[in-house]
């Protein structure tokens, strides 16, 4: 399967846009799979007793986060190999804001394993992201609850995505998630992969 990595900071709407990507691809009868990098990491972290929920993973020591990243990359790469023709999209982050600084979400040992065709940066205005976070009470995102931090994280994500892309010859594409119409971003992502 061709792999596209869809990144974006918490609250930008990655999961919503990727749900729309799946819906559109199903309508077009294109084989597809959407995987969440964090789900792979979370399953391993919970098995090892490191965390009780997804949001605790950002606060783990960096060495433990790296271990979880490697396991997730291997699992996803295997899924893509076994998936045949079609498109596989990974829902993840280009950077993770941790207490000790920004952790690359797609470091060399991850990006080379996955070898994507495109790294997408799903973005929105920081004010819009903050509003979305406030509406989503199911998640704990206090470490991203300031416009300045959101802007800083978006910039670091751009730098990190380009650095990762250089290692595997992938392209990097910024896609704006328009408020109220995830189909716009979804179609832009799909068209970049076909």
Curated annotation (Swiss-Prot):
Catalytic activity: AMP + ATP = 2 ADP
Catalytic class of the enzyme: transferase
GO molecular function, one term: adenylate kinase activity
InterPro entries: Adenylate_kinase_AdkA (IPR023477), P-loop_NTPase (IPR027417)
GO CC term, one of those recorded: cytoplasm
SUPFAM superfamilies: P-loop containing nucleoside triphosphate hydrolases
Binding site for ATP: 8-16
Enzyme Commission number(s) from the entry: 2.7.4.3
Domain of life of the native organism: Archaea
Keywords attached to this entry: ATP-binding, Cytoplasm, Kinase, Nucleotide-binding, Transferase
Subcellular location: Cytoplasm
Similarity comment: Belongs to the archaeal adenylate kinase family.
Name listed for the protein in its UniProt record: Adenylate kinase
Name of encoding gene: adkA
């Amino acid at each position: 399967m061709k792999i596209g990595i869809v990144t974006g900071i918490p609250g930008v709407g990655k999961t919503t846009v990727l749900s729309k990507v799946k819906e559109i691809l199903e309508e077009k009868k294109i084989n597809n799979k959407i995987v969440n990098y964090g789900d792979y990491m979370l399953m391993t972290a919970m098995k090892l007793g490191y965390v009780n929920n997804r949001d605790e993973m950002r606060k783990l020591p960096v060495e433990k986060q790296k271990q979880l990243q490697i396991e997730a990359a291997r699992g996803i790469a295997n899924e893509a190999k076994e998936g045949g023709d079609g498109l596989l999209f990974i829902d993840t982050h280009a950077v993770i804001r941790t207490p000790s600084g920004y952790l690359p979400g797609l470091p060399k040992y991850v990006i080379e394993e996955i070898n994507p065709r495109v790294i997408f940066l799903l973005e929105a205005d920081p004010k819009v992201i903050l509003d979305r976070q406030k509406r989503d009470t199911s998640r704990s995102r206090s470490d991203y609850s300031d416009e300045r931090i959101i802007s800083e994280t978006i910039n670091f994500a751009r730098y990190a995505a380009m650095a990762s892309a250089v290692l595997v010859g992938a392209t990097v594409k910024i896609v704006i998630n328009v408020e109220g119409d995830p189909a716009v971003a979804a179609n832009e992502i799909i068209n970049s992969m076909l």
